[in-house]
Amino acid sequence: MSIDINNRLYTALVTPMFVDGSIDWGSFENLLRIQEYQGCGILILGSTGEALALDFDEQCEVVRFVTNLNLNVPIMVGVGGFQLTKQLQWIEFCQTQRVDCFLVVTPLYAKPGSASQTSWFKTVLDKAERPCMLYNVPSRTGVNLAEEVLTSLKDHPNLWALKEASGDIQRCARYQELAPNLVIYSGEDGLLPELADVGVKGLVSVISNIWPEQTKEYVKQSLAHQIAITDKVIWEVATRSCFSVTNPIPVKAWLAYSGVITTNTLRAPLLANELEDLSLLIGADSLVKDWFSHI
């Protein structure tokens, strides 16, 4: 079966865990099947999936587990770190599995400049045998994706898309201007309507862990420029509820509360008790479900 990677909605999936921190495969499959049922593309081992808190063997086990389920939606795998050789080894492993595409983040911690970024991304793209989505998220990496990366690599056969999560609408528009054939996805749930106005074609979402069906409708309306201002506010509230403390703490808390996964456990350095209560999530859940009931 051919998989279309140009899904308008990808869910950046959490990695469910037992209280002892081991991966909860039963909850993981439950979460994956829910996303598959709604037709959402799936991103595993991104920051929401706590990829860097898992060792290499665990990461490989996650990829094997997910791909062996033979889901009928596209599977994207996160590529991110500091040591280039390890990222290339990771890509090499993933390409032995049924992985459809990669999410490749700007190198972490080092804050590389234009030339360094371009060299890094070219090396990764050359290694990849799958379409790649670059990822600009300066709040996590400390640096924006350099414009030179796009001007230099926009015609690379393995460069497919960009996830833009700087929160800067004009920057997103500039990236689209520099690489007009690049498919740009919003990495900011609450900004999708505004980013759609400058050419964004989809969303890589955190909140769709909780509300996959409703988020699909939100994406549909946003990309069609049909979402009302009052409705947009609802999705801004929903987004804030999932980012009141560091992601994925709130999302895991709600999924455990609602019985989708067994616990809200995270790996160090994150602790579940940073979220003091569920009041924001309870309020957002009510708003989102009421909005959807009137569609």
UniProtKB/Swiss-Prot annotation:
Domain of life: Bacteria
Residues annotated as binding pyruvate: T48, V204
Signal peptide boundaries: none
Pathway(s) served: Amino-acid biosynthesis; L-lysine biosynthesis via DAP pathway; (S)-tetrahydrodipicolinate from L-aspartate: step 3/4
InterPro entries in the cross-refs: Aldolase_TIM, DapA, DapA-like, Schiff_base-form_aldolases_AS, Schiff_base-form_aldolases_CS
Subcellular location(s) per record: Cytoplasm
BP GO terms, sorted: diaminopimelate biosynthetic process; lysine biosynthetic process via diaminopimelate
Pfam families: DHDPS
Active site, per annotation: Y135, K163
Site (Part of a proton relay during catalysis): S47, Y109
Keyword Lyase (UniProt): yes
Predominant location: cytoplasm
Function per UniProt: Catalyzes the condensation of (S)-aspartate-beta-semialdehyde [(S)-ASA] and pyruvate to 4-hydroxy-tetrahydrodipicolinate (HTPA).
Entry similarity comment: Belongs to the DapA family.
UniProt xrefs under NCBIfam families: dapA
Name by which UniProt lists this protein: 4-hydroxy-tetrahydrodipicolinate synthase
Organism field: Francisella philomiragia subsp. philomiragia (strain ATCC 25017 / CCUG 19701 / FSC 153 / O#319-036)
Gene name as annotated: dapA
